[in-house]
């Protein structure tokens, strides 16, 4: 399956050896002993085939949380399994892949040249293959690049020695829990608000991202950042995805609920650990 199936299987593998409600494992965030599992990937996005994480939704309480356990023993990646995917699922998978990289890249400048270049390589690849993948999902070479990009985006390869963000993902998880939006679709909306609100904090990386990925080199720093954020949003638009909450009929009621959930849990995300309930509200308001 894809991320949802694999992640659910990871919870089953942990729950089989747990004496209690498997939801306890999710709330703890860490599994103990697990039954070994293998995966055959049929939807590329989450990297679950080569990482130890899993994200689980509980529909009756509208909650969505991550936990960590063992890696799959092995995974089979055959691009031909992607041939039957609807174009929207491909678009959401590409968005998820892209934002996975940004969560590890768009943080603190000057930490690792190698991590930056690896991350930029995946970003460039996704930008280049996205139109081809959406035009012809049966193009073996293109779907191979897509499948491997999604795996490498979240298999711990590009995070070595660098700070990470994940605020966009945590806010996106709440949107999925509350509105059943596909995960990648939530990221295509929230990432733009994150970059707008935290532009000063992310200034150095935004300038680097704009130059190296979007070719933005002219104008003042502020103008370059504006154009970079605009290019970022335009990319998700090119996938056919919404980039504003209002396009999905989401407004103040949801923003207030997400702010409340962040505050109630005491959650703080971002490379500076400054995305709390109030900051999550600002980010969401910037997505309206």
Residue positions per predicted region:
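N-terminal small/polar loop signature for handling phosphorylated ligands or for N-terminal nucleophile
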Residues: 1-20, 29, 132-143
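Short glycine-rich anion-binding loops that position phosphate/pyrophosphate groups of nucleotides
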Residues: 2-5, 43-45, 250
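A glycine/threonine-rich phosphate-anchoring loop and its flanking beta-alpha core
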Residues: 15-114, 208
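Active-site segments that bind and position negatively charged phosphate/pyrophosphate groups
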Residues: 104, 108-231
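C-terminal charged capping/lid subdomain of soluble metabolic enzymes
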Residues: 216-288
């Amino acid at each position: 399956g894809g991320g949802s199936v694999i992640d659910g299987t990871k919870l089953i593998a942990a729950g089989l050896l747990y004496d209690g409600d498997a939801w306890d494992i999710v709330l703890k965030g860490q599994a103990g002993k697990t039954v070994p599992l293998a995966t055959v990937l049929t939807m590329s996005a989450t990297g679950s085939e080569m990482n130890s994480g899993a994200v689980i939704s509980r529909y009756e309480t509208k909650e969505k949380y991550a936990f960590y356990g063992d890696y799959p023993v092995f995974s089979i990646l055959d691009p031909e399994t992607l041939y039957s995917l609807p174009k929207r699922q491909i678009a959401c998978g590409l968005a998820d892949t892209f934002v996975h990289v940004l969560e590890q890249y768009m943080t603190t400048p000057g930490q690792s040249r190698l991590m930056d270049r690896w991350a930029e390589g995946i970003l460039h690849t996704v930008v280049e293959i996205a139109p081809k993948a959406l035009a012809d999902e049966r193009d073996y070479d293109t779907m191979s690049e897509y499948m491997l990009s999604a795996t490498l985006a979240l298999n711990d390869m590009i995070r070595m020695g660098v700070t990470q963000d994940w605020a966009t993902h945590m806010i996106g998880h709440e949107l999925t829990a509350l509105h059943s939006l596909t995960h990648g679709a939530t990221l295509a909306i929230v990432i733009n608000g994150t970059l707008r609100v935290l532009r000063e904090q992310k200034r150095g990386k935004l300038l680097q991202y704009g130059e190296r990925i979007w070719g933005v080199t002219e104008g003042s720093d502020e103008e370059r950042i504006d154009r970079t954020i605009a290019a970022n949003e335009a990319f998700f638009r090119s996938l056919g995805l919404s980039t504003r909450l209002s396009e999905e009929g989401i407004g103040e009621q949801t923003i207030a609920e997400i702010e409340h959930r962040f505050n109630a849990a005491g959650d703080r995300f971002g490379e500076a650990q400054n995305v709390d309930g109030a900051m999550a509200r600002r980010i969401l308001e910037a997505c309206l």
